[in-house]
A protein has these predicted regions:
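A short, basic/flexible loop-to-alpha-helix module at the beginning of a structural domain
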Residues: 1-8, 67, 142-145
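N-terminal Rossmann-fold NAD(P) dinucleotide-binding loop
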Residues: 21-22, 87
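NAD(P)-binding Rossmann-fold cofactor-contacting core
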Residues: 29-55, 133
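Generic hydrophobic/aromatic pocket-lining and core-packing "Φ" positions
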Residues: 25, 66, 91-95
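Rossmann-fold NAD(P)-binding glycine/threonine-rich loop
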Residues: 107-131
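Rossmann-fold NAD(P) dinucleotide-binding segment
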Residues: 71-77, 81, 85-108
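General beta-strand structural signal in soluble alpha/beta enzymes
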Residues: 13, 37-40, 62, 104, ...
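N-terminal Rossmann NAD(P)H-binding glycine-rich loop of SDR-like oxidoreductase domains
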Residues: 17
Length: 145
């Protein structure tokens, strides 16, 4: 039984084209997580190639915004692998889009930025659950990573 993440969760990766995003997307796919795309405004309209848990090649679309990714894929979870300087804006974008769960992996996020993104989430009232910043991720054994 999962609390936040399960085999049916549709996950987008903010920062999918960066080094950490690329590495961890591969690991999540290998664990069976249903990654449905990524977000990078500068690389929107492209795809990234990976291999899923069954060894099959997958092409993941890259979108300009979280809202666009959610509309196209039905994503309900976002995991953020963005540099600390961009974490607040990326998080607020996901919150404003109404993502159900936001997992912020990034470490070194300024405390002020963390406080502001949490205050923004509370003010919107859209019930986005946030784990992080500076989080090692979440796992539901046998279902998703």
């Amino acid at each position: 039984m999962s609390i936040f993440l399960n085999k049916d969760s549709k996950v987008i990766v903010q920062g999918i084209t960066g080094g950490e995003g690329t590495k961890h997307t591969a690991r999540m796919l290998a664990a069976g997580t249903q990654i449905v795309g990524g977000v990078n405004a500068r690389k929107a309209g492209t795809t990234v190639s990976h291999v899923d848990a069954n060894g099959a090649a997958v092409e993941l679309p890259v979108f300009a915004t979280v809202a666009e990714a959610m509309a196209a894929t039905g994503a309900d979870v976002s995991v953020a692998f963005v540099p600390p300087a961009f974490t607040k804006d990326a998080s607020i974008e996901a919150i404003d889009a109404g993502i159900g769960l936001l997992v912020i992996i990034t470490e070194g996020v300024p405390v002020k930025d963390s406080a502001e993104l949490w205050a923004h989430a509370k003010a919107t009232g859209n019930n986005t659950r946030i784990i992080g910043p500076n989080c090692p991720g979440i796992i539901t054994p046998g279902e998703a990573l």
